[in-house]
Amino acid sequence: MKLKNLLLIVLVSAVLCACHSNYQPTTLTVASYNLRNANGSDSARGNGWGQRYPVIAQIVQYHDFDIFGTQECFLHQLKDMKKALPGYDYIGVGRDDGKEKGEHSAIFYRTDKFDIIEKGDFWLSETPDVPSKGWDAVLPRICSWGHFKCKDTGFEVS
């Protein structure tokens, strides 16, 4: 009986050792940030876009976000963020024309860490493939999405 138990332990150990892989867990630091549109009245109160975006960039750099989503961001704000964050790029289109006009729900990602496998945008409406308002919305609502692959590990995330 003792010999059978010993053989069983050796067999199980051998199987477990054979199953060992080089899998390394991937840590992913993500965030979502409502940047708030560049509203002129905010500047009068001291928290305009010109005051906010350097602080936002510092927060992103401090936390070393791999990927972060944005809301309420116009094209010029995206350009400011990209300039303030070398090593990041973004995906996403404007909600008004599917190109550059209107607010974006862009996704920033670290270009040294990720490749884009696939990306897209859709509108929250009855016609999700074209810029449009849905149901009871006052303005068009857009969703941007991306499928990324980690350059080092091959890990994929959407």
Where are these regions (language model features)?
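N-terminal secretory signal peptides that target proteins for export/translocation
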Residues: 1-2
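Sec-dependent N-terminal signal peptides
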Residues: 5-14
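N-terminal, active-site-proximal structural segment of metallo-dependent hydrolase catalytic domains
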Residues: 7, 18-85, 95-103
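Structured beta-strand-rich core segments of catalytic domains in phosphoester-bond hydrolases
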Residues: 67-158
